[in-house]
Amino acid sequence: MLDLKFVQNNLDVVRESLEKRGSKLDVNEFSDLDSRRKSLLQEVESLKAERNSTSGEIAKIKREGGDASEIIARMGEVSGKIKALDEDLKDIEAAEREWLSSVPNMPDESVPFGKTEDDNPVIRHWGEKPEFDFTPREHWDLAVELGGVDFERAAKLTGARFVVLKKWGARLERALTSFMVDVQTMDHGYTEVIPPYIVNRDSLFGTGQLPKFEEDLFKLKNWEYYMIPTAEVPLTNLHRDEVLSEDDLSIAYCAPTPCFRSEAGSYGKDTKGLIRQHQFHKVEMVRFAHPDKSFEDLEKMTGHAEEILKRLGLHYRVITLCTGDMGFGSAKTYDIEVWLPGQDKYREISSCSNCVDFQARRANIKFQPKDSKKKQFVHTLNGSGLAVGRTFVAVVENYQQKDGSIVIPEALRPYMGGLEVITAE
C-alpha cells in the first residue's frame, strides 16, 4: 500500500504511475474524496473552536450569575453537529483507505516502460538450447507414456487442471523439492519454514491478494480462511505487526508448499500438461531487507533462483518486467524463463520481486534503526526458487532421449536413489 499522505500530496505522481501500469483506477475519485475530507475537517475544527471559546463564555456568565441556557442549548446542537461530521469523516477516510488498497505499487525508476509482456526486455541468457536428432515431444505425452503422470485419473478424482504423479513422477517431484530446499538453505543461507497452507484475510491483505484478487483464491466454505496461492503469503506475514531489529536484516526464509489457484483469468490457456494447475508445488523465497539494500537483495535472490537451473543444466533467460506487466505489489520484477524444447518456447519458472515498503505498510512490518527513534517499514522481497512442477516439465523435455527415455540430471541423482535414466517399465 502506498503512503496515504504521499498520495494526498502527490496525486499527479500517482496518476502518472497508474498510467504507466495501464491501470484504469480513477485518481479523480480519490481527489474528490480527499477534497470532501478536507472540507469536513475544516468544518469540524471550526465547530470545535467555537465550542471551546464558548465554554469560557458560559463559565463567565455563570460566575456573574447570568443565564447561559440559550448558549448551552446552542452548544448542544454544535456538539451534535460535530459528532455527525466526525462519523462522516470516518466514512470518508474509510473510503480513501479502500481506494488506496486497490492502488498497485509504483514502478521503480529503473523499470522499463511497456504495455504487455511483448515489451519485456531480455537482460541475459545462460546455457545453450539442447540439440536433438529427433523431434522433441511435449511432456504431457512423454511423461504419461512413461507412467509417471496421470491426468485422466486426476480428472476423475477432481477435475481439469489437476494431476496424479506416481512412480518415478512422484519421486522426481520430491527429489526436485528436496534439491531446491537444500540449495537455498545450505548454500544460500535461507531458513526453512513449513507454514500453514490455510491463511486468514489479514494475511492475504498484507501481501496484496485481497481485496482486489479474491476471485483467484480458493476460499473455505463457512470460514474466513483461504488456501494459500503461494508461500509468499504466510512467509511475509510471519512478521506482521512486528518491529524487527536492524541488525537482523536481511532475514531470508524459504518454504516448500503446495499452492492453490483458481486460474480465474486463464480460461483456455495451457489446458494440457503441468504448466497451469489449480494445485502445484513451489519452493518460495522471501526476504525482509533494509531499505538501503533491498535492490541489492533482489539481484541476490534472482541469482539464487538461477542457481537451481544452472545446476540442473537447463538453458534459461532472465527478463525485466515492464511497467504494464508487473504484479500488483511489485516495484521491480525479474522473470526467469526456462527453455522447453517440446513446446519450442520459453516459459516462466520463477518471478523475483522487490515490493519495497508496499507489503510492509499493509502488514505493518517495521524495523528499529539504531541511529533513530523513529521506526521504519522494512522492504519485502519474494521469488520462486523454483516452481517445482515447471522444473519437472523442463527436466522431462530437455533430457528426453530418442528412445523415449529421460536422463536424470546429475545433480538430482543422489535424490533419486542413484537412478540415472527413466524408462518405460
Curated annotation (Swiss-Prot):
Which cellular components does GO assign to this protein? Answer: cytoplasm
Disulfide pairs here are: none
Localization, UniProt:
Cytoplasm
Q: Which residues bind L-serine?
A: 230-232, 284, 384
Catalyses: tRNA(Ser) + L-serine + ATP = L-seryl-tRNA(Ser) + AMP + diphosphate + H(+); tRNA(Sec) + L-serine + ATP = L-seryl-tRNA(Sec) + AMP + diphosphate + H(+)
What domain of life does the UniProt record list for this protein's source? Bacteria
Q: Which residues bind ATP?
A: 261-263, 348-351
Q: Name one Pfam family in it.
A: tRNA-synt_2b
Domain comment quoted from the record: Consists of two distinct domains, a catalytic core and a N-terminal extension that is involved in tRNA binding.
Task: Report the protein name in the record.
Answer: Serine--tRNA ligase
